Amino acid sequence: MADFKKTVSTLFESVDIQINGSRPFDIQVHNKLFYSRVLSGKSLGLGESYMDGWWDCEALDQFCYQMLWGRIDKQIKVKSPAFLMHVLRAYFLNAQSKKRAYIVGKEHYDTGNDLFALMLDQRMIYSCGYWKDADNLDQAQINKLDLVCRKLHLKPGMRVLEIGSGWGGFAKYAAENYGVSVHGITVSKEQMEYAQESCKGLDTSFELKDYRDLNGNYDAIVSIGMFEHVGYKNYRDYMKVARRCLDDNGLFLLHTIGRNTPSRSTDPWTNKYIFPNGMIPSPAQISKSAQGLFVIEDWHNFGQDYDPTLMAWNENFQKSYDNLKDRYDERFKRMWEYYLLMCAGTFRSRRNQLWQLVLSKKGLKGGYSYQNSHRPNS
């Protein structure tokens, strides 16, 4: 037991984190079994032990930043059999197959509209905001929605397909401010019903559908925060579907979290508790999947903006928890704050990125550009 504690203490000290130290990002350990649990389970052991109250940290976001910036993950050599099985499973199974496509909808996005309504902005946008010229979450999300509309060159009367429509925030904004018709698909029943109610009276429609079943012809396609659920085995098929549904002169905007290097597995804790079967793509994986199908017109990275987005979500969640605790117990609260704050640390450390790609079928004559600032009717 003493050896376990010494090993973990040495690892944390290598990234300037002290056990039972006095700084906000130092951790306070309450259970002596914490050390063996972390060494055997890595990220899964760290996250589950936090959920169980074995340790605390005043600034989880900065704790995560310290670990990732210092590359502590490269120093932990001990891997549990469960972790190794998780990696092997990712290699040999298609965890994002059509048969499994609705799992994340039921287990994450159907968690409860009450939780997301209190945590997110007024438009219920569950993706990175664009914080340029914004000082609050609502404005950052409006900025992001308008940025997407301008990048797609939206004009009144255009038909837009949204792959992964969430609670209908983009569809509502685009229909109200740009006069377009939006058809959205989702794998979450609660999201679909919320979007249908929210967008009543607008030229929008929503359905419960897997992206592989899509057909039709659209002037523009947008996918915001959905590609992370596709999986590397399906990236090429996803791009083929987008090409099939896009008009020859149309634009496709892909908004996704990205990682700096390719991976065929995801974080075990995140996979178990937050996004089952999720996977973050790399630049090479995206480029390869689009090769021969699309011309990449623009590639915009504003990953630094996910840090304040996640911090704002956590602030809203903490402020609202008294209204949620009858349904969500203390262990859920610790799980959720761990998810939000540790994710903030991944973006702060630049381990994760946020990309918006604009793609066309054959390249735009004269090149691609978009208006820097213009918001009609809003």
Regions found by a protein language model. Give the residues of each.
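A short glycine-rich, Lys/Arg-flanked "PGG" loop and its adjoining helix->strand segment in the class I
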Residues: 236-248
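Conserved class I S-adenosyl-L-methionine
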Residues: 157-164
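Feature captures hydrophobic
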Residues: 1-141, 147
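Conserved SAM-binding loop of SAM-dependent methyltransferases across substrates and taxa
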Residues: 167-178
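Conserved SAM-binding strand-loop segment of SAM-dependent methyltransferases
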Residues: 200-211
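A short acidic, Gly/Pro-enriched loop at the edge of an enzyme's catalytic core
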Residues: 212-221
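Conserved beta-strand signature within the Rossmann-like core of class I S-adenosyl-L-methionine
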Residues: 249-257
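Substrate-binding/catalytic lobe of Class I Rossmann-like enzymes that use SAM or dcSAM, i.e.
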Residues: 257-366, 374-376
